[in-house]
């Protein structure tokens, strides 16, 4: 049973398309996605990565940004086919916590990208 779990983990890490990018909590990211509603169009999203959840088959990140004075959080699965490109723009200053959930209580001027 243990060997099966180890082989599944190795296969999942080899399949990861974005394993070259070393994304950490607190990074400012720019993600390009493809939307397939009526037409195929690309959308560029920017935000602060406030959390990363690593599972056996996939990795999920949470982005937070203020758009038009309203806070917005989005979750993305890194292995999803709708994600075209992930670019690390910068890093926020401050605490070295693993999860940046304290940014939810901060003012919009401190969280704006």
UniProtKB/Swiss-Prot annotation:
Q: Name one Pfam family in it.
A: Ribosomal_L19
GO molecular function terms attached to this record: structural constituent of ribosome
What is any one GO biological process for this UniProt entry? translation
Which compartments is it annotated to reside in? Answer: Mitochondrion
User: Might you report a single GO cellular component term?
Assistant: mitochondrial large ribosomal subunit
Its main subcellular localisation, reduced to a broad class, is: mitochondrion
Similarity comment text for this entry: Belongs to the bacterial ribosomal protein bL19 family.
The name on file for this protein is Large ribosomal subunit protein bL19m
Q: Which organism is it from?
A: Reclinomonas americana
User: Which classification does the entry list for the species?
Assistant: Eukaryota, Discoba, Jakobida, Histionina, Histionidae
